[in-house]
């Protein structure tokens, strides 16, 4: 994977704060009630990162609020199977340095228990070491699901479970928990 999208209470304030740290914006989308800033991957250690806001959703932590990129009818496609997106895992040859960089860029201190984890208000970003010279990438998404056994059964039927037992779609590992 190549991109992490985060929601904020005030995307324009976050844009100003992050660019004030020397990070370049590669795209801004300010359309109606929606604000988004895509930051240069090189400035985020190799991952395209976007900080977005949907102004018509008064509480950005509300999981079923408006979200313009998903279209007006996204709720109709929602399923009761997935309860939450719990974490994103980024693989990096220098995971400690990248975790520290992201902590600065996001204004989020690392977990006291694990400096490779950045706790967010609704989930976390995890950093895992990769082999020297390996590219930085989004390696995994952790989903909290209603029935992990059923999700695994469907993944097997869809042929997206590898020989290592991991569910992978588009090169990204999907970790599931109940």
For each feature predicted by the language model, list its residue ranges.
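A generic short-segment signal for beta-strand/edge and adjacent turn/coil regions
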Residues: 5-9, 18-22, 55-59, 87, ...
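Vicinal oxygen chelate
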Residues: 1-93, 121-126, 132-178, ...
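Surface-exposed interaction/gating patches
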Residues: 71-114
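Aromatic-residue detector
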Residues: 2, 71, 82, 102-105, ...
């Amino acid at each position: 994977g190549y991109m992490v999208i985060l929601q904020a209470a005030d995307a324009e304030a976050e844009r100003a704060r992050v660019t004030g740290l020397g990070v370049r914006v590669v795209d801004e989308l300010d359309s109606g009630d929606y604000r988004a800033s895509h930051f240069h991957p090189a400035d985020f250690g190799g991952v395209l990162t976007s900080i977005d806001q949907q102004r018509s959703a008064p509480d950005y932590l509300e999981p079923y609020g408006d979200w313009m990129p998903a279209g007006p009818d996204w709720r109709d496609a929602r399923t009761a199977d997935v309860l939450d997106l719990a974490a994103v895992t980024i693989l990096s040859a220098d995971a400690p340095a990248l975790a520290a960089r992201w902590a600065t860029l996001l204004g989020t201190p690392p977990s006291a228990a694990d400096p490779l984890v950045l706790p967010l208000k609704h989930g976390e970003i995890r950093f895992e070491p990769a082999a020297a010279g390996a590219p930085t990438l989004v390696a995994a998404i952790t989903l909290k699901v209603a029935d992990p056994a059923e999700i695994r059964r469907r993944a097997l039927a869809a042929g997206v479970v590898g020989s290592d037992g991991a569910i992978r779609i588009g090169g990204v590992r999907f970790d599931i928990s109940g």
